[in-house]
Structure formats: structure tokens, C-alpha cells
């Protein structure tokens, strides 16, 4: 369960399914243009009391075997269209910046520089949107995959968002802190959970 509280008032209580459904609905309704999430430059719009900006941590290229291990590569290539590059797919890591009153909330932080030179652009993108990383007051993780939270730390190991509090759904937290989780993961994904 995710509660977004801004200026001390609960505005939105969501589970992951409801959050993703709302996001998909906004795209389908044209509130967020389909191509906005693929833009490298910040894209801003207003929704109720929120000023929302789509920022970027960069682009991420993943093999089809990671994107959808059970799908046929030719089906994925057809589905992904221009995002497909041979047997790989390119995605934009697009965290959302929400502002309301004194709250500056970042939904996800991207992958940081851990996925190569095309990632790790979140501080630069925030600055292009008129916000310094140090101004972020809350970071909310939609889920704890590396491409959503590894952008929290810089190359120096320090927080990119030194003045923020950090939030994740309780069920998500409990999953990732499960004892011996690495032994339950596929071999090629054990590195996601080993410390």
C-alpha cells in the first residue's frame, strides 16, 4: 500500500496495481501523451494540486531474455517496434517529479550509472527541470528493481538526495529483506539481492 502525503495531508492511497492502472489510464486518456515518457527533456503538466514533471535517468537497453524470458524474440520485436534493437529493447527510465506546496516528491530514481553510460542522468534531468536534487523532500519507490532505485546513490556512494526521506510499500520491503532471498532467485539475478 502506498500513501502519498503532501503537506501533512493524505492525498492518495494506492496499491501497486491501482497505481499502475491509474498511470496507464492517464496515458490512454491523453493526459500524458504516449511519447512523453520517451522524451529525454523534462515534460511538465498539472494534475489537480500537483505540478508533475517527467524527468529522465537515461536509456536502458536490455536483452529480450530479461524483458520477457518466455516470449518469442520475433513476437517481442514486433510488439516493441522502434524500441527493439536486434534482440534487445531500449527503454527510457522516466521518474516522475511531483510538487505541491513545500513537498518535492520523486517517484523512483532510475538506475544511476550501474547500467552503463546511458544511465545516471537523474540529477542532470532534475536540474534541467528547474529542481536541484537536494531540494527533493521525499523519494517514493514504486517497486525495488534496480532500474527504479539504484539512482539513489551517486558514484561516490553518497545519497543523490541528501534531504529526502525514502518510502516503499511494506509488502515490497518485506519481499526484498526475506532471509536467503538470493538463493531463491534465478542464478542470473542473484546479484540484485546480494550485498
What is each of the regions a protein language model found here?
Residues 127, 135, 162-195:
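Metallo-beta-lactamase
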Residues 65, 151-152, 178-179:
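Short, solvent-exposed loop/turn and secondary-structure capping segments
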Residues 33-35:
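N-terminal signal peptide c-region/cleavage motif recognized by signal peptidases
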Residues 15-23:
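N-terminal export leaders
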Residues 41-129:
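Conserved beta-strand hairpin/beta-sheet module of binuclear metal-dependent hydrolase folds
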Residues 110-112, 145, 172:
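Catalytic metal-binding/acid-base residues of hydrolase active sites
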Residues 1-14, 28-29:
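N-terminal secretory signal peptides
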Residues 95, 117-167:
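Active-site metal-binding motif and surrounding structural segment of the metallo-beta-lactamase
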